[in-house]
Regions:
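Outer-membrane beta-barrel transmembrane strands
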Residues: 237-255, 261-264, 347-402, 421-429
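Small-side-chain secondary-structure face that scaffolds active or pore-lining regions
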Residues: 178, 268-281, 296-302, 308-313, ...
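Glycine/serine-rich loop-strand microenvironments at binding/catalytic pocket rims
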Residues: 290-295, 316-365, 378-394, 400-415
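Short coil/turn segments at secondary-structure junctions
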Residues: 62, 232, 356-360, 416-420
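Short, small/polar-rich motifs associated with maturation and membrane association
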Residues: 1-302, 310, 370-371
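A surface-exposed, glycine/aromatic-enriched loop/edge motif typical of exported proteins
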Residues: 193, 197-198, 203-214, 302-344, ...
Length: 429
């Protein structure tokens, strides 16, 4: 019924829009191309996708920006500072460390204020395991297609009371129907360093200060050493990190697929700290019966190894005597310098910061597997009526070890220390 010469606009969620000039034809056959890039008008709201203008709650959707993403060890780094009302505070800044996420501030003084995290339709347990305190650390940032944040109380209508602090919905990348097999590699190298040091006295300044304050013949002056040690320089380093990802994607008949593996190795600027992660993901999305039956299978696995540095070494480096050496050959403490009085270790004295890092070994190893299968069926006699089934699991195990020998300033009094702890969790949907 459109008049001749008029322009007909055709659009659909997930496809490129087309404008067609009516030449007077009685019938038009229009084929829309899939558009996986333009997602500004589409948001995921828990039970499907809608246009942003049709969403009734407070919703923010973003896509990861490869051109301006910075150093992204975890998924948390990708949204930090990019969504209004979402505040992220990292726990110490070590590679792979946890983070506190708050959507529109905290709502409880005693209960949890953590938002609910949903990955490909599967709610994830917010309780971390040994080695991975942040559930967003378990997913490879390279696999993420979109973030959607539900900020207000309307999210509780979908997910219940768990969503009272907001919801972070993560949609991972998928293959494209009918596309040819494609293999891609994405890699980067990063360098991290501290920008400045805490201003403290150098060795000569400290000697002059002690001499002027207590006198040249005082016992305090006799305790001074002959070295010139920059303790902050001894514990910090320029850290190098690498990230590698290989992806195979395509569409086999009516079954789009995507398989990816990733490896991340990030050293911390505090010596001995290190985060290493292996990830793998599989997505299959076959459709049957002229797209009336759609199946979406997702599986993501992660293995991480984390070496924790003793952050107490930072305070010790600021306070330690710069005239003392890092090592003095004392076998009682593994060769490291330590304060003594008449040959006895002074337990209340500031400990050697380098020894705190090198002689304390605290490591965590964790494994995580998240998977779900969604089955969606549109009835032939009434396409608006759908049956949807979502089955999923979230399994994780984490082990943390701590050890320092008795021949160390840390372990001299306690005759050394060793510890071991394991946490397992299993959740089914």
């Amino acid at each position: 019924s459109a008049p001749k010469g008029s322009t007909i606009g055709i659009s659909y969620i997930g496809y490129k829009s087309q404008d067609i000039i009516n030449q007077g034809q009685s019938n038009l056959i229009v084929v829309l191309q899939e558009d996986t890039e333009v997602l500004d008008e589409i948001v995921v709201i828990g039970y499907g996708t809608v246009k942003k203008d049709d969403a009734t709650g407070s919703v923010t959707a973003i896509k990861p920006d490869k051109m301006n993403r910075g150093l992204t060890t975890t998924a948390t780094d990708m949204i930090n500072g990019k969504i209004a009302g979402v505040n992220i505070t990292t726990d110490g800044g070590a590679p792979g460390s946890g983070a506190s996420i708050r959507i529109r501030g905290g709502s409880s003084l005693s209960a949890s204020n953590n938002p609910l995290i949903v990955i490909d339709g599967l709610p994830i347990d917010n309780d971390g395991i040994k080695g991975v305190s942040n559930p967003l650390s378990t997913i490879n940032p390279n696999d993420i297609a979109t973030f959607t944040v539900l900020k207000d109380a309307s999210a509780t209508a979908i997910y219940g009371s768990r969503a009272s602090n907001g919801v972070i919905l993560i949609t991972t990348k998928k293959g494209e129907k009918g596309s040819r097999p494609r293999v891609t590699y994405d890699g980067n190298v990063s360098i991290s360093t501290k920008t400045k040091s805490i201003d403290v006295m150098g060795a000569d300044e400290y000697r002059n200060f002690v001499t002027d304050r207590f006198g040249a013949e005082s016992s305090a002056v006799k305790l001074l050493g002959k070295e010139n040690t920059d303790w902050q320089k001894e514990i910090f380093r320029t850290a190098v990190g690498t990230d590698h990802n290989i992806t195979v994607s395509g569409g086999l008949n009516n079954m789009p697929y995507r398989v990816s593996i990733g490896y991340t190795n990030q050293n911390g600027i505090l010596k001995t700290s290190k985060f290493e992660r292996y990830t793998g993901s599989v997505n299959l999305a076959p459709s049957f019966f002229e797209d009336h039956l759609n199946i979406n299978f997702n599986a993501k696995g992660m293995i991480s190894n984390n070496r924790f540095a003793d952050t107490g070494a930072i305070g010790a480096a600021i306070a330690f005597d710069p005239t003392q050496p890092v090592m003095n050959g004392n076998s009682k403490y593994g060769g490291y310098f330590a304060w003594e009085n008449a040959g006895e270790f002074i337990s209340i004295a500031t400990k050697n910061p380098v020894a705190m890092l090198q002689q304390k070994k605290e490591e965590a190893n964790s494994k995580n597997l998240v998977g779900n299968i969604q089955v969606d069926y549109k009835f032939h006699f009434l396409p608006e009526l759908r049956a949807n089934l979502n089955l999923g699991m979230d399994m994780a195990t984490g082990t943390q070890d701590i050890y320092y020998p008795k021949e160390s300033p840390l372990g001299y009094v306690d005759n050394g220390k060793t510890g071991y702890e394991t946490i397992d969790k299993y959740n089914h949907l």
